[in-house]
Amino acid sequence: YGFCGRLFDEYRAYNLDSSFVYAQRKEELAHRMDKLDYLDDAAMNMAEVMGTTGMYKEALELLGQIDKKTLPDYLYGYYYHLYRTIYGLMGDYAVTEKVKKEYYRMTDLYRDSLLQVNASDSLGHVLVMADKCIVHAQYDEAIRMLMEYYNKPSLDDHSKAMLTYTLSEGYRLKGDKQGQKHYLALSAIADLKSA
């Protein structure tokens, strides 16, 4: 099960078909082991791939089958992250303003849930908080908190890639093209190093 999980993680960024296959294998193994938390994790992996490929309805149906009351603490962040991401994508592609607003409202709710379950000193918390600031046009505050975290010496390349990409978004929306380019370049470099 753990090996399939590592393969899912390796493939998720560039080969969704393969990552989905490993999520399905995780589900098969979880059934054999009769481990509910493994089943929930595998279902969330499949929902992640579905959401990434635009199968929003199917992803939400799969997530809706998970009983939140029995979900172990270590899976709450992933659970809320998936809902936040899928509703955010649905909002981005909604045709009518009314539907777009509803999806973004749901995105905000799950973003707030994420902030409650992520440790306040974690990268996940900082990225979600910066995302919230960016959505509410508080670009300078988002940039400030991201820069504060960026200067931590223990940051790995994958984390740097995510953080600098979010910084580039803050600068883009602020209208600072130079800052945007600078942090996009740093994000690309960190992404390549982490591959």
What are the language-model segments listed below?
Residues 1-195:
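A "functional boundary" signal
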